Amino acid sequence: MRTELISIPTDGVPLDGALHLPDGQIKGSALYFHGNTMNFYTGAARFLAPAMTAMGWAFLAFNRRGHDILTTRASRAAEGGAFQTVAESVADNRYAANWLAQQGYSNPVIIGHSYGGMLATRHVVDHPNTPALVLLSAGRGGQENVSGGRENLFAMDRTQELTDQAKALVAAGQGDALLSLPGWWWVISARSFLDRLQHVPDTLALAQQIRCPVLALRGDQEDRTRYPAEEFQAACAGPCEVRVMPMCDHFYNGCEEQVAKEVVTWLGRLQQL
């Protein structure tokens, strides 16, 4: 495997990433969308790269502007997931796809983990020539599924209280002011908080417009209501296969090899059709 660190231009901050290439002939390409507060070098972005390149595929993983929780770049200005908006996330995925096409890899398979999977459904609907979609623990999305659950996410039982605080800050021109959350991901700007309540893609609604083959995977330790692979399969307009991985959490800790095998085996079968 050969890895090239790359930079993708946008209308603002460039996106860092890694293009992983096989040593031999390139037989396909895939574009990976990371989840909330993650990045191009952790989780599935990391463990899928050697598996994908071993089967002869180019594999691009990149940071959206909303990567990690908080970060800095070439200044002391704060950036990262605490400030992300859905529109910016959708745009960043489009920038990455366009960059990959400019390298000669048009219409890649799309792979998304968690929030990246939710964004992947939006991307595939907007790019109907996508040959296949892999959803790794994609969330339900939509306006009714933003907090709580057994994983203690986001605002938990303080959604209304924090919504009122965020609205007051935005109205005062302080949309970038940070709020502490009682659950993961712990810190978020007022503007980003309100944006998430309103604009996160509705995965199941978008499934009705997706006709390419889909693999929907999740761990058996995950909340099947929050990560509804079976419901996505039922709603999907095209063929969809579901895999529930045993002894497996949301980040696939200890199950990396098995998850990678499921993904490349499924993609390999598609190549033979």
Regions found by a protein language model. Give the residues of each.
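Gly/Ala-rich beta-loop-alpha elbow adjacent to hydrolase catalytic centers
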Residues: G112-G116, A120
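Conserved alpha/beta-hydrolase
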Residues: A49-S75
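Short beta-strand element of the alpha/beta-hydrolase
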Residues: K27-G35
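Alpha/beta-hydrolase active-site loop
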Residues: G80-Q102
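The alpha/beta-hydrolase serine catalytic core
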Residues: G81-Q84, E88, N129-V244, D249-V264, ...
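N-terminal cap/lid segment of alpha/beta-hydrolase-fold proteins
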Residues: M1-G24
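Short beta-strand immediately N-terminal to the catalytic nucleophile in serine-hydrolase-like folds
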Residues: N107-G112, L136
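The serine-hydrolase catalytic nucleophile loop
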Residues: T37-A49, Y227-A229
